Amino acid sequence: MSALQVFKKYPRIFWLSNLIELFERYAWYGFYMGFGLFLVGSKETGAMGFSSVEKGTIMGTGSMLLYFLPILTGAIADKIGYKKVLLMAFLIYASGFFMIQQFSSFEMVFISFIWICVGGAFFKPIISAMISKTTNPETASIGFGIFYMMVNIGGFIGPFVAGIVLGKGWNFVFMLSIAAIAINFLITLFFFKEPEQKKTPTPLLQSIAQPFKNIFTTLINWRYTMFLVIMSIFWAAFNQLYYTFPIFVEDWVNTATIYQGIHSIFPSFANLIGTPEGTISAVTLSSMDSFFIIAFQIAVSAFVMRFKPLNAMMGGIFVLSIGLFLMFGVQSGWIVLFGLLIFGLGEMSSSPKFTEYVGNIAPADKKALYMGSSFLAIALGHQIAGFLSGAPYEKVADKLFLLKAEVLKRGLSVPEIGDNFTKTDYFNEAARQMNFTQQQLTDFLWNGYHPQSIWIIFSSIALSAVVLLFLYDRFILPKKNR
């Protein structure tokens, strides 16, 4: 069957579901890619001015819930209807994006982000279920390919645009996300049709309790549980793309060279995407990971299909660890961008194979249960990633933390950061007392405190996942499942 014939077989609701996914991913990643910067940025920019530890706590806990709660929210959606849950998810989303701008305390921002993640958890299982319901064995492969393409298009355009409007203020970033969610609300309200489902007499509470029984059924398989724990280590390293990379770029990387390179060929485009200072924002740069996936996923998938899923995962994670070294080990904007490409190639090789591998090792009569519980590895990975981006990152690579250490070492008198003295004020005053420009201060801290050594931690974590997967394959997994 040709691709055109396959396209004709998809019902209208299939395309509508993909459109909803596109706008939701635009809203989420437009917000999420820069969320770490929003949490730790200086207050006069409209950011929160939190510490790296506070940022890691907020992002790690909320994102963990985002991947854990769908185990429950999927059961709720099946019981009360997809359309109702979608509308509720979009209302929670929009109100959360609005709320988080209104507060300045750690506690209220934390609660607001949890609220946003609850909205995401209600949304997450529905569209993938709709794709499954509107495809058959003949159309499923291309159908899910279209779905994942929508995920990555939204994941690229959202932060790419957010990075451009960020110069006007954080409120513009949140308003763009709210606008995308509002469009989804209207599409769902007026055009989304509830799929046909078999009604069951099972009470709602019993339906919610069933997923926990399913989780227990899978986790008593100690080999599978061990595999999930190992993969959570991979996800912890991978998620530094969101938790620390934009902050590292903002603090240490010279993106002016990228801007100048683009400007020399396409000056109008450089002026459009660049900052007034002649740089590329950290959020816009980070969005290139999704762009690389859009450009190369098909080619990479064709290449790795010749390998067993576990071997492809190990190779992909190894490549990803090299990408982490290039992303966090240098100040050159072009090398960091190349590191993002290497990171993306590793992601393309390993992440899709994770799902395939779970399907391969699951008992034939429990594949759905195993696929559902596989999200526990991602949830745990987010919690670990939040911890790593907190105290470990702060002590090794947080620019403010390192500057405070130097101020103390020199015995300088710089006021403490507070409501009337921001992080920017601290950097300016410290630089003045040390007779440095801001660039000279950055270079001094880079050469004296070596924040680039954070790559050793992140790459080592990724490599440890490779080693553990190798040992798991050789000594834990039964031969028939290799």
For each of these PLM feature ranges, what is it?
Residues 139-166, 180-184, 373-389:
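Glycine-rich segments within core transmembrane alpha-helices of 12-TM secondary carriers
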Residues 91-105, 318-331:
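C-terminal ends and interior cores of transmembrane alpha-helices
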Residues 1-14, 198-228, 261-262:
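Juxtamembrane intracellular "pre-TM" segments in multi-pass secondary transporters
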Residues 33-54, 243-281:
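Short amphipathic helix-loop junctions that connect adjacent transmembrane helices
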Residues 171-190, 405-411, 452-471:
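Symmetry-related core transmembrane helices of the 12-TM Major Facilitator Superfamily/SLC fold
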Residues 122-136, 349-363:
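Intracellular juxtamembrane helix-capping segments at the cytosolic ends
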Residues 57-75, 287-300:
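Central cavity-lining transmembrane alpha-helices of secondary-active solute carriers
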